[in-house]
């Protein structure tokens, strides 16, 4: 294989990861850079923004907190909420976590370094803990009459750090990085983040799904599960109990597709009848 062929092969094996990074960096830069002939593409932040001066986008979790705090949404914010909620409801809520959220780049870096350093420490934590954090954040919102979670939200602090060099933002990002690196694998996104918990519920029946229609080519190596940030979502597919990942925790990150050397997995948009996984047998 030529050097160029080797490069192409290496890029193809990371096609989903590279695609996500391009999208994430574009979104970050859209809020920061004045583009030629266009100017600033997005004004605001990931909580509520206006794109190209015409398209309002509002985080549904922010909208929910606003309602719980007793604040009525402005018409533009309501329209933005419907647009964003509709998108994630159709395609899968946790697409936000792997394709939009900038914190994902921080936690992915921690995971990569953890693997390179062969760090074994992994504190046991229930994945349901993030649902408890979600519930607590809404309770605090009701009691305080404010968007309580936004005082601690790493996503908000990340954008403040980029725009105004916030010391608090730097400390939170460093803490999350060290937590994921030293304490537990995928600790923040996989066990604690209430935003991810909210989007998992919102996009439970999203139609963009990982499928194993070529299950006969599966080598049974388990490499897809090892790289998956939410490995429990792949268990029914790998054990051949279903040919489609239907769990709301799936982030559609494509890590399993990048890792699968046999092409047994694919990402497909299913617009047919709702299903929870069609039983299959090994060929």
From Swiss-Prot:
Disulfide bond positions: none
Binding site for [4Fe-4S] cluster 2: 228, 250, 253, 256
InterPro entries: 4Fe4S_Fe-S-bd, 4Fe4S_Fe_S_CS, Electron_Trans/Redox, NapH_MauN
Signal peptide: none
Pathway: One-carbon metabolism; methylamine degradation
Positions of [4Fe-4S] cluster 1 binding: 218, 221, 224, 260
Residue stretches making up the 4Fe-4S ferredoxin-type domain: 208-239, 241-270
A single cellular component GO annotation: plasma membrane
Keywords in alphabetical order: 4Fe-4S, Electron transport, Iron, Iron-sulfur, Metal-binding, Repeat, Transport
Domain of life: Bacteria
A GO term for molecular function: 4 iron, 4 sulfur cluster binding
Function: Involved in electron transfer.
NCBIfam families according to UniProt: napH, PRK09477.1
Name the record gives this protein: Methylamine utilization ferredoxin-type protein MauN
Gene behind this protein: mauN
């Amino acid at each position: 294989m030529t050097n160029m062929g080797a490069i192409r092969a290496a890029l193809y094996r990371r096609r989903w990861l590279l695609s996500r990074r391009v999208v994430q960096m574009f979104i970050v830069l859209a809020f920061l850079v004045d583009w030629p002939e266009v100017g600033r593409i997005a004004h605001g932040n990931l909580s509520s923004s206006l794109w190209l001066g015409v398209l309002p986008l509002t985080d549904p979790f922010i909208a929910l907190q606003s309602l719980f705090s007793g604040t009525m949404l402005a018409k533009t914010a309501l329209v933005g909420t419907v647009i964003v909620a509709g998108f994630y409801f159709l395609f899968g809520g946790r697409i936000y976590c792997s394709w939009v959220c900038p914190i994902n780049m921080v936690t992915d870096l921690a995971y990569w370094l953890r693997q390179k350093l062969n760090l074994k420490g992994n504190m046991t934590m229930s994945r349901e803990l993030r649902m408890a954090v979600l519930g607590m954040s809404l309770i605090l919102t009701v009691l305080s009459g404010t968007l309580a979670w936004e005082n601690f939200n790493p996503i908000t602090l990340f954008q403040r750090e980029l725009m105004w060099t916030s010391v608090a933002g730097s400390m939170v990002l460093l803490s999350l990085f060290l937590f994921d690196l030293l304490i537990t694998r995928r600790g923040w996104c996989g066990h604690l983040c209430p935003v991810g918990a909210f989007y998992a519920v919102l996009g439970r029946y999203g139609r963009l799904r990982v499928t194993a229609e070529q299950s006969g080519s599966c080598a049974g190596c388990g490499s897809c599960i090892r790289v998956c940030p939410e490995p429990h979502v792949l268990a029914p597919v790998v054990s051949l109990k279903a040919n489609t990942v239907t769990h709301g925790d799936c982030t559609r990150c494509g890590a399993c597709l990048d890792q699968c050397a046999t092409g047994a997995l694919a990402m497909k948009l299913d617009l047919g009848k709702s299903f929870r996984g069609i039983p299959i047998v090994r060929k």
